[in-house]
């Protein structure tokens, strides 16, 4: 059986690493524009579970995925291959 590397984007939501094009800071102007366009075109995936959006992932399919995990944490998970949830990464609601 082959292995498919996945990235935990928070709250038990995962995405195939091979499908991720970029990870953006949610507060950037470009990310906000992508989010608005994707919502109007029904291409928006919200994986925040009601928390503040911190990262915007652009997927190969053209979908935009919202995550409550900081881009730095997601990048670290990608680099190390460790999907362990760090203390405080998902619990805070600020």
Swiss-Prot record:
What is the disulfide pattern of this chain?
Answer: none
Domain of life per record: Bacteria
| Coiled-coil region list | none
Q: Can you tell me which family this protein belongs to?
A: Belongs to the RemA family.
Q: Under what name is this protein listed?
A: Putative regulatory protein LEPBI_I0950
